[in-house]
Amino acid sequence: ASYKVTLKLDDGSEAVIDCDEDSFILDVAEEEGIDIPFSCRSGSCSTCAGKIEGGTVDQSEQTFLDDDQMEEGYVLTCVAYPTSDCTILTHQEEEMIG
């Protein structure tokens, strides 16, 4: 299956990508030329963090976020697969760390 992922970028613009259920959101965004920050690419830091505004993802491979952060909607886009159409606010590392 493929899902529409709407990325709300830090400059106020939005980008919509078609992301397969077995593709990481960050990888597809990069292929489309969308600038999302990243560092480790393995779900063990917070550089690529986003916040889900709607829809669902599978980020079971991540090791950085705690349960509270995930309940608040934070997502590591480098290890997140879409499980529905979803909307993600990008560039959320500073907001998340506070």
Curated annotation (Swiss-Prot):
GO biological process, one term: electron transport chain
Record domain 2Fe-2S ferredoxin-type: where: 3-94
Cofactor(s) annotated in UniProt: [2Fe-2S] cluster
PROSITE patterns for the chain: 2FE2S_FER_1, 2FE2S_FER_2
Protein's cellular compartments: Plastid, Chloroplast
Methyltransferase recorded as keyword: no
SUPFAM superfamilies on file: 2Fe-2S ferredoxin-like (SSF54292)
Domain of life where this protein originates: Eukaryota
Protein family (similarity comment): Belongs to the 2Fe2S plant-type ferredoxin family.
A GO molecular-function annotation: metal ion binding
Name of the protein in question: Ferredoxin
Predominant cellular place of this UniProt entry's protein: plastid
An annotated GO cellular component: chloroplast
Cofactor note: Binds 1 [2Fe-2S] cluster.
Role: Ferredoxins are iron-sulfur proteins that transfer electrons in a wide variety of metabolic reactions.
Binding residue positions for [2Fe-2S] cluster: C40, C45, C48, C78
Pfam family, one: Fer2
Keywords noted in UniProt: 2Fe-2S, Chloroplast, Electron transport, Iron, Iron-sulfur, Metal-binding, Plastid, Transport
